[in-house]
Curated annotation (Swiss-Prot):
Cofactor(s), names only, from the UniProt record: Zn(2+)
Gene name of the record: mep
Signal peptide: 1-19
Organism of provenance: Aspergillus niger (strain ATCC MYA-4892 / CBS 513.88 / FGSC A1513)
Species classification: Eukaryota, Fungi, Dikarya, Ascomycota, Pezizomycotina
Name the UniProt record assigns to this protein: Extracellular metalloproteinase mep
GO molecular function: metalloendopeptidase activity; zinc ion binding
Keyword Secreted: yes
């Protein structure tokens, strides 16, 4: 996978650097630019303020929150056909999240989604949707011009230039209507799949398409190919870009501290089986309910029998120093560090609301909701690339997959598993993709702007976690500086509240066409709000939040909680304005809106104040530094 080159802009020192993977395809996987094929977003989000003042969306509370949500959908889009998606859940803040998919002639409109958030009082809190409201075509199913699923697979392979051999493929009907599985395809990790769906095109019309799913390992693609003409209308990529001797939680990389021995580091309230059991089997290696970590030198898709360190006494202690070479000489330490960081983050996220019912990553959900059998597959020293990392997020019930690489910008080279910020960034892709639009709809950050925010959430969470006891709002942080052997890191600017160090604002996005650049703007805004809340409530430097009445008592964990809750509230493929409003709504639910002004001031400082707007006509953004009345 090719990297995205950015310019480091700390002070006056321009420098070309290699960033985390962009959306362009690796030559062993395909040969086209995926960014040019991203789906566009046409979602709208109606926040809690507008719901309270708009009588047209008033819906009385029904016996079950899903019935209340369905009544709202009927009121907003009368006459539309839709189905309830079975990943609805009640978050730990008491808000119920319900998801619907629009249908036509019994077929899904794959990018027409409706999410409804029901408050603790049983009434609608907020909602978002991208339902199609234009002229509905007659059924195409009797049209003899509709491609066969085999022809659609061939068309997708040729259009995306996938290294997929399908000469001897056989086709089997799957459980769903107009769904098929292709057996004996060579070059994919798993059998490709096809499903007949409608797709809303950017110009606002519907197309009947075959959705071809191909897991090529480096890219896990949903290709929407016209069911009659083989034109590609869009692509979604699921890949975004005991005792343990480790760099402890909060130590971002070897430049920040030293390894230490931690004993039984799990949080039993989040990992009831510890990190080395799944409730059925106990392990003496880096495998458990939340993750399975191993060496993957070939870069292949198999993992169950890969090398992983083991000790019958559960002493996961192996030597490492940054001066060791080659990387193979410290692979056990690398695997243990990756396993530790991913598990520690799982436990923190659990306390912040990313639980089984919300779609988290666990092999055994213990009847707590959601779909299980989906721990995170952690590949240390993955041999498929260098100086990168990525995370594949399929729907709930299918394992996530993180690949960590060796970074070759230094001598000796450096192992990305020892840079906690990179691991946390990648894992956060799984969080934001599972929470936005529902855990069964992993394509809800597929538009350019929403995909950019996906990168930004990863950077923000990694940065918030590494904040030190003596840090203040004047403290700035880069991303990936140690791994990349560059003090500037892998982003255009450091995360800072200073316009001198980081001049980005909302309208900066107008000139950006890459998700990592857009994500830097979003994470910068979140960093501003973070320090406003820390200044108000102080900062908890422990590894877990302290709650009072369900609310973190400090500003750092409060902001992280609001970010996680906001992901669950926002619509599929949100823009900056909608995601900001979702965070404001999350604060209303959690604290009664006590932090309204601190949140507004942080966003307004960077141009996302009251009146800031995103045009769906020309995709341009109008900035504003205005604050609402009362702030």
């Amino acid at each position: 996978m090719h990297g995205l080159r950015l310019v480091c802009s700390i002070g006056t020192l321009p420098l070309v650097i290699l960033a985390y993977p962009a959306a362009s395809l690796h030559t062993t996987s395909a040969a086209v630019d995926l960014d040019s094929l991203r789906l566009t977003s046409n979602s709208e989000y109606v926040n809690s303020v507008h719901v309270d003042t708009n009588r047209s969306v008033a819906v009385s509370a029904e016996e079950h929150y899903t019935d209340t949500a369905a009544r709202l959908v009927q009121n907003i889009v009368p006459g539309a056909s839709f189905r309830l998606i079975d990943d609805h859940f009640v978050g730990d803040n008491g808000v119920a999240h319900v998801y619907f998919r629009q249908t036509l002639h019994g077929i899904d409109i794959d990018n027409a989604d409706f999410n409804v958030n029901i408050g603790k009082d049983g009434l609608v809190l907020s909602f978002g949707h991208s339902f199609f409201t234009g002229a509905l075509p007659s059924s195409h199913l009797d049209n003899t011009n509709v491609l066969s699923p085999e022809a659609a697979l061939r068309g997708a392979r040729d259009a995306i230039q996938l290294p997929l051999t399908i000469d001897n493929v056989s086709t089997e009907a799957a459980e769903g209507r107009n769904e098929y599985i292709f057996r004996e395809a060579v070059g994919a990790v798993s059998d490709p799949k096809a499903k007949l769906v409608y797709l809303v095109k950017p110009e606002g019309t519907l197309a009947l398409t075959w959705r071809i799913e191909t897991d090529m390992y480096e890219h896990w693609l949903l290709t929407y190919i016209d069911a009659e003409t083989t034109t590609v209308h869009g692509v979604v990529d699921y890949v975004a870009d005991a005792t343990y001797q480790v760099y402890p939680w909060g130590t971002n990389d070897p430049a920040e501290g030293h390894r230490t021995i931690v004993t039984d580091p799990w949080d039993l309230s989040a990992s009831a089986y510890t990190w080395i059991s799944d409730g059925r089997d106990n392990y003496t290696t880096t495998r458990g309910n939340n993750a399975i970590a191993h060496w993957n030198p070939t870069g292949g898709g198999s993992y169950l029998y890969n090398l992983r360190p083991s000790d019958p006494n559960l002493n996961f202690q192996w030597p490492y120093s940054p001066n060791m070479s080659p990387p193979r000489s410290y692979i056990n330490a690398s695997i243990v560090q990756l396993f530790y960081t991913a598990n520690a983050y799982h436990d923190l996220l659990y306390t912040l609301g990313f639980t089984e019912s919300a779609g988290n990553f666990q092999w055994n959900n213990s009847a707590h909701g959601g779909r299980d059998k989906d721990y995170v597959i952690l590949n240390a020293q993955d041999g498929s690339g260098f100086s990168n990392a990525n995370f594949a997020t399929p729907p709930d019930g299918i394992p996530g997959r993180m690949r960590m690489y060796i970074w070759i910008e230094s001598t000796p080279s450096r192992d990305g598993s020892f840079d906690a910020g990179i691991v946390i960034h990648e894992y956060t892709h799984g969080v934001s993709n599972r929470l936005t639009g529902g855990s069964h709809n992993a394509g809800c950050l597929s538009a350019l702007e929403s995909g950019g925010m996906g990168e930004g959430w990863g950077d923000f969470m990694a940065t918030a976690i590494r904040i030190k006891p003596n840090d203040t709002r004047t403290t700035s942080y880069t991303m990936g500086a140690w791994a990349d052997n560059d003090k500037c890191g892998v982003r255009d600017y450091p995360y800072s509240t200073s316009f001198t160090e980081n001049p980005l604002n909302y309208t900066s996005v107008n000139t950006m066409n890459g998700v990592h650049a857009i994500g830097t703007v979003w994470a910068t805004m979140l960093y501003e709000v973070l320090w406003n809340l820390i200044d108000k409530y102080g900062k908890n430097d422990g590894s877990r939040p302290v709650f009072r009445n369900g609310v973190p008592t400090d500003g750092k964990y409060l902001m992280m909680k609001l970010v996680v809750d906001g992901m669950a509230l926002q619509p599929c493929n949100p823009n900056f304005v909608q995601a900001r409003d979702a965070i404001l709504d999350a604060d209303i639910v959690l604290t009664g809106g006590k932090n309204r002004c601190e949140i507004w001031r942080g966003f307004a400082k960077r141009g996302l104040g009251q009146g800031a707007a995103h045009s769906s006509l020309n995709w341009m953004r109008r900035g504003s530094t205005l604050l609402p009345t009362g702030c």
